[in-house]
Swiss-Prot record:
Tetramer of two alpha and two beta subunits. This is Ribonucleoside-diphosphate reductase subunit beta nrdF2. Disruption phenotype: Lethality. One of its GO terms (biological process) is deoxyribonucleotide biosynthetic process. Belongs to the ribonucleoside diphosphate reductase small chain family.
Length: 324
């Protein structure tokens, strides 16, 4: 050991009985209460419904889910992790580790769907497409650029836009199928993911606003300009990505409205004014209905389960019950 080496003389354990920010405990409890795993959703019940889709509709669905997998991979392995060094409290660090883990659960969820409904060749083709699609790769490049930078508040902006905006061009399609009574178990799983992402976007946006209160007015103005510039850049790319995916099935304009609707929600999470007027965000009511907790699948956004979510029940037994 060299003479210049310095040992850490004290390490503090996280104490949940001493909170600097009550929001950390509130969000932790919400996230852990919402915990779920994809293996508990019986996607196999959607096999007959999958068979009613055309070859083009199947390809579209797989490409949409592959794009979502890429975003979850980025958020789970880079995005949420990159926010940890800038956490203001140890409890915030804990929440961010939970977020990172659940993003990896989300990424695995799509593989669960693929392995149930698709052939290996189809899966490989979809992942190959994700690596070759210019707009999908550009989306990842833009976000990663800020995750790997050295400006904590800009990282939070990029993360909030990913959580609250970028996912939604993909989330549209399973809600569309669900509104037509197709792939309803898959839609139930996507609702579980959407519920998580809503909490993630809210929390990271909240932490951005807390950090914003600590900087001067000039920096605040610069960050606001940056946020809208980044949103415009991401939105323009997302429109091209949406056209590439949805033009053939005639859904592009509806998806764009859904994008603008969620872009406004992302800005609100960051404490900023909505960008798009109401007449440009009038989402198809069937999609909003499919998103709601009272959708046909009776998904409960707050209990951690939907009608498709299966959990074993404990039954009291006696020794004689095990004599076969």
């Amino acid at each position: 050991m060299t003479g210049n080496a310095k040992l850490i003389d004290r390490v503090s354990a996280i104490n949940w009985n001493r909170l600097q920010d009550e929001k950390d405990a509130e969000v932790w409890d919400r996230l852990t209460g919402n915990f779920w795993l994809p293996e508990k959703v019986p996607v196999s019940n959607d096999i007959p419904s999958w068979g009613t889709l055309t070859a083009g509709e199947k390809q579209l669905t797989m490409r949409v889910f592959t794009g979502l997998t890429m975003l979850d991979t980025i958020q789970g392995t880079v995005g949420a992790v990159s926010l940890i060094p800038d956490a203001l409290t140890p409890h915030e660090e804990a929440v961010l580790t939970n977020i990172a883990f659940m993003e990896s659960v989300h990424a695995k969820s799509y593989s669960q769907i693929f392995s149930t409904l698709c052939s290996t060749a189809e899966i490989d083709d979809a992942f190959r497409w994700s690596e070759e699609n210019r707009n999908l790769q550009r989306k990842a490049e833009i976000v990663l650029q800020y995750y790997r930078g050295d400006e904590p508040l800009k990282r939070k902006v990029a993360s909030t836009l990913l959580e609250s905006f970028l996912f939604y061009s993909g989330f549209y399609l399973p809600m569309y199928w669900s509104s037509r009574a197709k792939l309803t178990n898959t839609a139930d799983m996507i609702r579980l993911i959407i519920r998580d992402e809503a909490v993630h976007g809210y929390y990271i946006g909240y932490k951005f606003q807390r950090g914003l209160a600590l900087v001067d007015d000039v920096t605040r103005a610069e960050l606001k300009d940056y946020t809208y510039e980044l949103l415009f850049e991401l939105y323009d790319n997302e429109v091209e990505y949406t056209q590439d995916l949805y033009d053939e099935v005639g859904l592009t304009e509806d998806v764009k409205k859904f994008l603008r609707y969620n872009a406004n929600k992302a800005l609100m999470n960051l404490g900023y004014e909505a960008l798009f007027p109401r007449d440009e965000t009038d989402v198809n009511p069937a999609i909003l209905s499919a998103l709601s907790p009272n959708a046909d699948e009776n998904h409960d956004f707050f209990s951690g389960s939907g009608s498709s979510y299966v959990i074993g029940k404990a039954v009291v037994t006696e020794d004689d019950d095990w004599d076969f």
